[in-house]
Amino acid sequence: MKVKICGITDMETAKRACEYGADALGFVFAESKRKITPGLAKEIIQELPANVLKIGVFVNESVEVIQKITENCGLTHVQLHGDEDNHQIRRLNIPSIKALGVTSEIDMKNAQAYKTDYILFDSPKERFYGGNGKKFSWELLAHMSKKLREKTILAGGLNALNIEEAIRTVRPYMVDVSSGVETEGKKDVEKIKQFIIKAKECSK
């Protein structure tokens, strides 16, 4: 099971997450309490292992700005958390992830229309897109096609206590966590370690 730790804002957390086995790290460039500057993201990314995916999170940003930040920071993928469509995705010409809030099985069916490398299923948006710590009904994704499952990233309210049930129900390609590995709004490296251990155990 692949694991993504999202909302990275400092070097120490990034390095520790990689040491514990994270397969991907997320850097939020949209409005969020976890927002990071491109300059700091670049410093962190330069120190990370080559095999770890570096994913930039954007919300309704222009194609030009996304391309510039991707190139300058050394991102491997972009995660689109807003109202982006296939036209914008094609113009980006960057490996991409489309994030969708899930309220019914219709959302799962609509996801198949997006021409992205991965689909991230998350809780419905609130004030900020993503990272709100709330789960949705995983059963809504239990019967997706094998083709969609192989490109599915599961997010939304995940933590070390519920990750086993989430993986067993959805069987995604990757799981994504942010607030579920935080203590008082800050990344907690011990929680990151335990989350990764639990998630990896599920795929043995």
From Swiss-Prot:
The lineage of its organism: Bacteria, Bacillati, Bacillota, Bacilli, Bacillales. NCBIfam families: PRK01222.1-3 (NF002297), PRK01222.1-4 (NF002298). The keyword Metal-binding does not apply. CDD domains: PRAI (cd00405). PANTHER family: N-(5'-PHOSPHORIBOSYL)ANTHRANILATE ISOMERASE (PTHR42894:SF1). One of its GO terms (molecular function) is phosphoribosylanthranilate isomerase activity. It comes from Bacillus cereus (strain AH187). Its EC number is 5.3.1.24. Pathway: Amino-acid biosynthesis; L-tryptophan biosynthesis; L-tryptophan from chorismate: step 3/5. Transmembrane segments: none annotated. It catalyses: N-(5-phospho-beta-D-ribosyl)anthranilate = 1-(2-carboxyphenylamino)-1-deoxy-D-ribulose 5-phosphate. Keywords: Amino-acid biosynthesis, Aromatic amino acid biosynthesis, Isomerase, Tryptophan biosynthesis. It is an enzyme of class 5 (isomerase). This is N-(5'-phosphoribosyl)anthranilate isomerase. GO terms for biological process: L-tryptophan biosynthetic process. Belongs to the TrpF family. It comes from the Bacteria.
